[in-house]
A protein has these predicted regions:
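Intrinsically disordered, low-complexity linker/terminal regions across diverse proteins
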Residues: 1-185
Length: 185
């Protein structure tokens, strides 16, 4: 039984419009989500379709989703070197794991509940480091003519930095690491 079963979609001939139908679907989705408040999390529901080439972390579920479609070239290739796969899919995995500890994920415990689990000292140091990232990225030109707001991009910047640090440390343990392949993949 889908939350869409009760959505009244109207064709143009019935006086409906694409915009109104999208609003009705969005409203039904919000009502469905609100109805889940206080119920156990259904771990069988995925946040993405298997054919989506992406990945995501959900702090409220403490869950990482890697759809099957991401496990193909160029993100993962059985014929690629260890460094190339680490620089591609390894980076994505490390990035999503780091979201559990970014400025948003840091506010949730291992069960996905909003909780203050840091020591005061650790959280103060974490915030200090986050401010450095905000300062670094603030005003950077992401694309020509468009500057970034370091505060708005903080979550992604923390996860990017964590992922780069992670894959760099892993590849540094190899006997003859090929950093060029790692960073170009």
């Amino acid at each position: 039984n889908s939350y869409l079963d009760n959505v009244d979609i109207k064709s143009k001939q019935e006086g409906g419009s694409y915009f109104e139908n999208i609003l009705a679907i969005g409203e039904a989705a919000m009502q469905y989500t609100a109805s889940l408040q206080g119920t156990p999390v259904d771990k069988t529901k995925w946040l993405m379709y298997p054919y989506t080439v992406n990945a995501c972390y959900s702090a409220t579920e403490n869950d990482i989703t890697f759809p099957a479609a991401i496990l193909q070239p160029p993100m993962y290739d059985v014929n690629a070197s260890y460094e190339e796969n680490l620089g591609a899919i390894g980076y994505v995995i490390a990035h999503e794991i780091t979201h559990a500890f970014d400025n948003n994920g840091a506010k949730f415990d291992e069960n996905g509940n909003a909780a203050d689990w840091w020591t005061k000292e650790d959280y103060a140091e974490f915030e200090k480091r986050c401010e450095k990232l905000v300062y670094f990225y603030d005003g950077q030109e992401g694309i020509p003519g468009v500057t970034m707001d370091g505060r708005l991009t903080l979550s992604e910047n923390v996860s990017d930095q964590g992922a780069v640090q992670c894959i760099t440390e892993v590849v540094s343990r190899l006997e003859n690491p090929d950093y060029k392949k790692l960073y170009r993949s």
